[in-house]
């Protein structure tokens, strides 16, 4: 268990990162500022301080975003090379804050994608 003082230190914004805000361009109506510090990103999300991190390696992705004041947030882990379900974290935060619904994941506006078979045997079976 980490002390509150240590959590405050590692979650403190150290560097303003306008490039991160640009990367999140589809969320700009709610992401007002982005910072980085000791492995964590800090965002001003619709006037609320939220902290998060995301990353991935071949075939696996993860994200975490939370509001330390509310002691609430979201964690998602998925096996994929795509960024989908990118936006899930913001849909959850909108629910926490009582903000109007936005389809941040764009599930209703993207055509369904056929998953790729996992190996050669499945590809041959699917053909």
Q: Where on the chain are the PLM-derived regions?
A:
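Catalytic loop of the DD-peptidase/beta-lactamase superfamily, centered on the K-T-G motif
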Residues: 1-127
């Amino acid at each position: 268990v980490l002390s509150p003082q240590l959590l405050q230190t590692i979650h403190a914004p150290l560097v303003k990162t306008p490039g991160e805000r640009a990367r999140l361009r589809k969320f700009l109506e709610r992401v007002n500022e982005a910072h980085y510090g000791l492995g964590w990103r800090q965002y001003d999300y619709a006037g609320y301080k939220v902290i998060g991190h995301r990353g991935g390696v071949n075939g696996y992705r993860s994200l975490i975003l939370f509001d330390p004041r509310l002691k609430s947030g979201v964690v998602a882990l998925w096996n994929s090379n795509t960024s989908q379900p990118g936006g899930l974290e913001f849909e959850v935060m909108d629910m926490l804050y009582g903000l109007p619904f936005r389809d941040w994941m764009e599930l209703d506006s993207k055509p369904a994608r056929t998953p790729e078979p996992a190996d050669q045997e499945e590809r041959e079976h699917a053909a």
